[in-house]
Amino acid sequence: MATIVVKQIGSPIRRPEIQRKTLIGLGLNKMHRTRELEDTPSVRGMINKIPHLVEIVEERG
């Protein structure tokens, strides 16, 4: 299956609780950390909820 590399570019400080939980759901918790995730509709939806906090670095597959 295809994967995407996601990088956290924004801080969760002073953000709504739902945005912080979305970051945790993606496996991110500190600035400039990256995660390689499966490219599924649920992951894409989570990324689309917080585009100001994360960026897609690379799409593989």
From Swiss-Prot:
List, alphabetically, the Pfam families matched.
Ribosomal_L30
Can the keyword Ribosomal protein be found in this entry's annotation? yes
Q: Which family does it belong to?
A: Belongs to the universal ribosomal protein uL30 family.
Q: Name one GO cellular component term.
A: cytosolic large ribosomal subunit
- Could you tell me the keywords of this UniProt record? Ribonucleoprotein, Ribosomal protein
Name the Gene3D superfamilies on file.
Answer: Ribosomal protein L30, ferredoxin-like fold domain
Question: What is the annotated quaternary arrangement, including any partners?
Answer: Part of the 50S ribosomal subunit.
One MF term in the entry's GO annotations: structural constituent of ribosome
Q: Which InterPro entries match?
A: Ribo_uL30_ferredoxin-like_sf (IPR036919), Ribosomal_uL30_bac-type (IPR005996), Ribosomal_uL30_ferredoxin-like (IPR016082)
Determine the domain of life of the protein's source: Bacteria
Q: What is this protein called?
A: Large ribosomal subunit protein uL30
A Gene Ontology biological process in which this protein takes part is: translation
